[in-house]
Design a protein with these regions (language model features):
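Structured catalytic-domain cores with a bias toward divalent-metal coordination
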Residues: 1-171
Length: 171
């Protein structure tokens, strides 16, 4: 299973809500790196005055976190005074907050991940790391960050994304 995370903006209003969810990471995309425009459900909700949050809990076939998600929602609802649940948990600690800053796109030269890269989301990289190649040209990281959403090679086609790059916002 993949590591759970919350996808949303990073504002005080959002932090009030995300404190009730059991995961360690928040991924924000204020510059629409993933879609080039407002294309996700959380972005749509934001565009219409709501607080949009997407709780990515893992692969669709992995139902091991269902009870935890229910508990998280109950805690949030009690906090918002939608229910009178006296057994609500306490808010969670600070999370790591990351911002999407770029995409890795397959070029006419193709693409391949360097040995050991592209196996899972949230892989940390450092400035100077070579994480892949466009043909024979290395993809060298210009800063520290994380590789997120690496796609299996089956889905790699010219002009399409094979992964995204994120930088940590809070230290």
């Amino acid at each position: 299973p993949s590591e759970p995370f919350l996808a949303c903006l990073d504002t005080p209003r959002h932090r009030e809500i995300v404190q009730w969810f059991t995961c360690d990471k928040v991924l924000t995309d204020p510059n629409f790196v993933t879609g080039g425009a407002s294309v996700t459900t959380d972005e749509y909700t934001e565009a219409h005055g709501g607080i949009g949050i997407c709780y990515e809990t893992g692969e669709a076939s992995d139902t091991s976190r269902v009870n935890q998600v229910i508990d998280d929602i109950r805690g949030l609802m009690a906090h918002l005074k939608i229910t009178c649940d006296e057994s609500r948990p306490t808010p969670l600690r600070e999370r790591e907050v990351f911002e999407l800053v770029g995409q890795i796109i397959v070029t006419s030269n193709g693409f391949r991940f360097a040995e050991g890269w592209g196996k899972q989301s949230w892989e940390p990289f450092n400035e100077g790391d070579v994480i892949g190649y466009h043909g024979e040209n290395p993809l060298v990281m210009s800063s520290t960050g994380r590789l997120v959403f690496p796609k299996p090679e089956l889905y790699w086609t010219e002009g399409n994304r094979v992964g995204c790059l994120a930088r940590k916002l809070n230290q």
